[in-house]
């Protein structure tokens, strides 16, 4: 039977999803949780709705965590002991990969043969585990990097730490071993081929999605009331981890420039910064708070803890514009979520953001991180109601092109393709 013939009959029963450094159960914006967590949880739930069981393996960070937790019907999150029962910095995790891999293999060993049909690893640490599990189980490995060290180092933010050589080598190994490589945009596909020598025929582009039922337009007045923001305020917002890569300082510096241009704006300006620094999730973003004081805008800046559920929706709905000033983004889920709520986005023209934001239609793309350029873009949207109204309509329309259902359908096609190719190759070798 040909590989195409196998593909028609193939449907995965159970997928092993590897997410070593962060759990889909964690609140995005805390610790190292972000868009990847949302991606894993949303696609896992959609897979389960299609009859595919999903088991997510992640490192246990507390002795109180049960061995397994049901995220949704058909989706199980397995906590694998590897190192101390506490959050670790990502730089400390490579030394725990042996223990983590052992836990993953031990879990499979207690099941019937052929329990998992495919492995999908997320981030390079998980790819290292997936590579070994792939060879042990005899199933294909699909890998999503989410971020790439060589790309991050080329766009390093001031004060940020370069990714180590060990990560670069680890990524190169995973790229060479994976059966399929899933990327968010064609730009990322080109980066994998050009910078990591990935085989072009192994790379597949699948755009992430957005929960269009949860993130949708609603009452701005109600959202502002819930946040304690005046109904007539000019509201700028940022949501995400507080780290140099995400560049929330760009928003604060641009805000200070706006106030210098028009001192009267201070009376009605509110800047919402929702998120926390990477780490334990308990810290406040002290350096960013100090910057607000230094810039003289601490009176208009409100620092909120990482927001989830309706609280995050309220932040998006309350804002006149959401800023995504990152130095690099493989895609930018925050931009999609905000636009789905009908809020225009001003974003940096980097990475996958030109796909997530339709320039001059759903928001504006800024080609630099220059303070005055950002102040101009923010003012154009936030201070001009006629511009904001047009972009708001375009924002929702643009976001509707993306859904987790569509993302999951594309992933399933890749899974079936990888399984067919893997089994076909095995058949040829056997013959």
UniProtKB/Swiss-Prot annotation:
Q: Which domain of life is it from?
A: Bacteria
Q: Which GO terms describe its molecular function?
A: acetylglucosaminyltransferase activity; D-inositol-3-phosphate glycosyltransferase activity; magnesium ion binding
**Chain residues that bind 1D-myo-inositol 3-phosphate:** 21, 32-37, 90, 123, 147, 167
Q: Which reaction does it catalyse?
A: 1D-myo-inositol 3-phosphate + UDP-N-acetyl-alpha-D-glucosamine = 1D-myo-inositol 2-acetamido-2-deoxy-alpha-D-glucopyranoside 3-phosphate + UDP + H(+)
The entry's UDP-N-acetyl-alpha-D-glucosamine-binding residues are 27-28, 35, 241, 246, 307, 329, 337
Among InterPro entries, the record links this protein to: Glyco_trans_1, Glyco_trans_4-like_N, Glycosyltransferase_grp1, Mycothiol_biosynthesis_MshA
Q: What is its EC number?
A: 2.4.1.250
Extract one GO BP annotation from the record: mycothiol biosynthetic process
Task: Tell me which residues bind Mg(2+).
Answer: 316-317, 319, 343
Family annotation (PANTHER family): SULFOQUINOVOSYL TRANSFERASE SQD2
Q: What does this protein do?
A: Catalyzes the transfer of a N-acetyl-glucosamine moiety to 1D-myo-inositol 3-phosphate to produce 1D-myo-inositol 2-acetamido-2-deoxy-glucopyranoside 3-phosphate in the mycothiol biosynthesis pathway.
**Descriptive protein name:** D-inositol 3-phosphate glycosyltransferase
* Native organism: Saccharomonospora viridis (strain ATCC 15386 / DSM 43017 / JCM 3036 / CCUG 5913 / NBRC 12207 / NCIMB 9602 / P101) (Thermoactinomyces viridis)
